[in-house]
Every structure is written in structure tokens, then in C-alpha cells.
Amino acid sequence: VNTSTYTSQSAFDGSRLRVILLVDLHEGAQQRFLDAYEHMRNRVASVPGHLGDQLCQSVENPSQWLITSEWATAPPYLAWVNSEEHLETVRPMQDCVRDIRSMRYSVVRETGRALPPTAQAADSVQAPVRAGDGVTRHALTFTVKPGSESKVADILAGYAPPEARADDSTRLRRTTLFMHGNRVVRTVEVEGDLQTALRHVSRQPEVRAVEEALNPHLEQSRDLADPASARAFFIRAAMPAVHHVARGGPEPSGLRRHALYYPAREGCGMALARLLAQQDETAAADPAGPVHRSTVFHRDDLVVRLIDTLDPETDPVRALGLHGTRKGAVLARLLDGAALGVEGPLSDDRDATRLLAHADMTLITDRRAAQS
């Protein structure tokens, strides 16, 4: 039995990132698309961490295009793609596009390209090849109007589960919803293609009814019947997974899923996500640790850490992702304790227990698809 740990995903390994957009244009939209691409290219060129891009046209179908961009590492790209500036930059292109699919890859090997000296030095150490588990993880987060929390919880807990299978190769495996105050976090696990699964789920009548019931309670209004409004809402709500680590071997019985909410001080979200990812790497190698698997989600100054654990209260320090000396002090510097109602240093188990109680999100529903 394999009992080793594996990290199936990490935005913090230092490897270069290749982002690929597959674009299918509306008929007659080619010139508008090219103008929009020039606008986007000029804006992206000045973003720190962006190395370059290419625009390619299909030789079989001129309406199909491929945009690739390369980034020094994943964090600068994630900061850019989650920004309001990105939303405004890509808006002119959206009217031209019938369908668009985005994919992100770490550059693991490369031949036949002359790299600048600094990049050559970085490339002398090859990026790690990850052992995947066949699952893509993603989260959405949004806020509801204060005072509507209990109503929203009832709506989210009461809907009928949608059909899990999107097609022969894609299925929704697990959906878990949490709340912390007026913030909602929905995490999903997908076997196959994430975008295919999300589109499939969004079309299901059970889900559409829930989304409509939520609309009056949202702080940020949306019109799901308007493609541009719906697209903007879900882009702003996206909270990508930036790290996932798990122990190999059989899953212990009695695991419970928790989501821990870490609001960061302004500008510290990526540093906080990186700290938790590094700590989870260390913890996964300890067979006595309470956490069997963990996923770190990050957007702007919000970090959510999803953990499957037996009993976090018995070891609050490690359940919070704190291992070794001084890590509590580092976390305290990055964390917006006032937003959690917990201020001051994290110097002992009592402080950790208090923080764990304030950071632990309320579980609304946890649904697994039937195995098929």
C-alpha cells in the first residue's frame, strides 16, 4: 500500500506557467476580435511576471483561434486574472466569442529555445512532475446581505442535487458549501474537465432554481439571464485552488471536512496562501498529524483552507497549518485578525484554539455523487 504523500497541485513551485485559450469566434467577428486582442496584448505586456504571448489561427477552421501566454510563475498570473483590471481588459473580446476554453499548464521540460541567462539558470532545475489523483478542485465565493444569512443557509441546504455526470468523461464528484458570517464558499471536486462540469451544473433546473432564489439576497447584484452579467459574477466569485496535498494509502474512517477562513491583511493574500501551502507540505509528511488532505484556495485577500481531518480540536496548532517555531507569529502578521474577531499574538495552544473556533466555517451541505 502506498502511504507516501503527494502534492497534485501547487502554484508555488517556481515553474513557468503556460496559459492557453481556445477561442471560437462568432461569424463576422474576426476584425473586432483582432482589435480586442491588440488591446488585451498591450495591457498584459506591462503586467509583472508576463513573459510573452502568441496568437494562432486554425489552418482547418479560420473561426478557431489559440492564444497562449507565458508567465514567470503562477502567482503573478493568478493575481492578474483575479483582478478587476483583467475583467475590464477582456470585456471587448467577449462580444466576439461564441465559446472560449481556458487551460493552465506548468512548463516541465523544454527544448530548442534560447533562454535569457537568468531563465537558463532557473531552468537548470527541472520543474517537478506531479502525481495527480484525477480530480480538479475549485471554489466560488460571494457575500450575501447582512441579516439574510439564515435564509441563504436554508436555500443552499435544501436544494435537490443535480445530475452528477456531464458526459462520458466528466462528472461532479463532491460539492461542499460553507458560510462564515455573510460569506458563502462553495467548493467542488470534478473528475474530468472543470469547465464542462460547471457548465453542465449551471444548466440543471435544480441549480438554476437555487441561483434565482439567492439573487435577492446577494450583495453584488447579477442577472443570470444576461450572459455578460453572469460571466462577470462568476469571474469575480472564482477562488482557484493554489495547492493540494494528501497522504497516500487508505483513507481513515471518520474523516470530517472543514473549511477554515483566513482573511489576510491588505496585499498579503498570496503570502498567506504560500505560508499555508508550505506548512501543509511539511505536515503531510508527519503520519501523526491530524490532517489527511488539504486544499488551499486563494483570491485577493481571502484564503480558504479545506481540510479532511479526524478531530481538529485535539491539535489546533497543526489543524490551523502551524508547524515549527515562529510560524504562529508569521501567520499573525499576515492575518487580518480583526476581521475574525481575534487579535493579538498566536503564542500557545489556547490562542490557536480560539483562532480555530473563529476561523472554522459553518458547514451547510456536503454532497458526494454516487459511484458509477
Where are these regions (language model features)?
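Short S/T/G/P-rich N-terminal loop/turn motif that feeds into the first structured element of a domain
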Residues: 1-64, 72-84, 92-93, 98-184, ...
